[in-house]
């Protein structure tokens, strides 16, 4: 890793104790064998120490993948193509970029019309962007678990490998990943930690970082406050502006609040039509100025 080479980890059965608490948890990508026992403290040790069995179903590959602790579950017979796909993204040389398409004219629209358009449930999001615009995609742990509102992936765009960190919007169609339910489009501490993992991954593999902004705003709850939401926003900003690898931010839709601002200060910032950025949603600004939300369109 110090030499910026990819470290891929495959956890077999069992993978516990010091192995899981050292190199087994330090890979750039970590997958496990189906049904593998994975955890820090083995269940027999726990039962002997505490006089009761460890809760069933916790220390399994499938459960840890659902919670985003590992990146996925891969059968032995599927390991070779999985590794090949991952290494194609992170280790192959960049290809020649394709010729750029001629720019299309952008029709001016009132700001509120753009806000309304960005909230349409059928508007393409980061999932659509990965499927339509990228090749050799490898989805990592951000597609599941507590950080499910942030998508983390390795992909190639026009032959150029990159790490993708994208805020996952709620839709039932274009933007939903196969095999997963749509996540709430509010960004909490775990989602920002996943974004920071993407930044570290880009730095460790010396790959460009693409950040896709599309969020209705931060999770506003006791859990978010106690989980250090403000601190995670600050650390995202700090990590991003000090990153040594090329960075591009894409305002794909809504760009509301601290979680959006935390992903903006890249080397290049692009905006899709109807993409917008604000420290809080228009309804919030209306509440501050007029003490109601009826003036949001103004």
Task: Tell where the protein language model's regions lie, with residue ranges.
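Cleft-lining beta-strand/loop regions that shape enzyme active-site pockets
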Residues: 1, 8, 153-156, 160-241, ...
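Conserved catalytic cores of soluble enzyme domains
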Residues: 1-92, 213-298
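Aromatic-residue hotspot detector
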Residues: 40, 57-58, 127, 133-137, ...
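General structural feature for long, well-ordered alpha-helical segments within catalytic domains
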Residues: 60, 75, 79-82, 111-113, ...
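Intrinsically disordered, low-complexity segments enriched in small/flexible residues
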Residues: 80-173, 180-184
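General structural signal for secondary-structure boundaries
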Residues: 110, 125, 185-188, 281-282, ...
């Amino acid at each position: 890793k110090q030499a910026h080479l990819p470290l891929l980890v495959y956890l077999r059965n069992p993978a516990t104790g010091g192995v899981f608490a050292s190199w087994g948890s330090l890979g750039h990508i970590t997958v496990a064998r189906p049904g593998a026992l994975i955890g820090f403290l083995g269940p027999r040790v726990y039962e002997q120490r505490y006089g009761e069995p460890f809760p069933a179903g916790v220390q399994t590959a499938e459960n840890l993948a659902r919670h985003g602790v590992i990146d996925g579950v891969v059968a032995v017979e599927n390991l070779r193509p999985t590794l090949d796909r991952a290494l194609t993204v992170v280790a192959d040389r960049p290809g020649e970029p394709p010729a750029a398409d001629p720019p299309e004219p952008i029709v001016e629209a009132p700001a509120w019309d753009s806000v309304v358009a960005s909230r349409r449930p059928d508007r393409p999001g980061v999932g659509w962007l990965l499927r339509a615009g990228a090749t050799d995609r490898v989805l990592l742990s951000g597609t599941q678990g507590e950080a499910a509102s942030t998508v983390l992936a390795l992909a190639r765009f026009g032959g150029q490998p990159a790490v993708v960190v994208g805020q996952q919007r709620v839709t039932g169609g274009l933007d939903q990943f196969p095999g997963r339910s749509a996540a709430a489009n509010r960004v909490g501490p775990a989602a920002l930690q996943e974004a920071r993992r993407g930044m570290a991954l880009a730095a460790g593999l010396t790959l460009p970082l693409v950040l896709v902004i599309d969020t209705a705003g931060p999770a506003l709850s006791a859990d978010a406050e106690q989980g250090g939401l403000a601190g995670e926003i600050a650390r995202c900003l700090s990590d991003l502006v000090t990153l040594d690898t090329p960075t591009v931010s894409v305002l794909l839709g809504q760009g509301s609040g601290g979680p959006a601002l935390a992903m903006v200060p890249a080397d290049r910032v692009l905006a899709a039509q109807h993409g917008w950025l604000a420290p809080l949603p228009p309804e919030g600004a209306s509440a501050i100025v007029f003490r109601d939300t009826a003036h949001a369109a103004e």
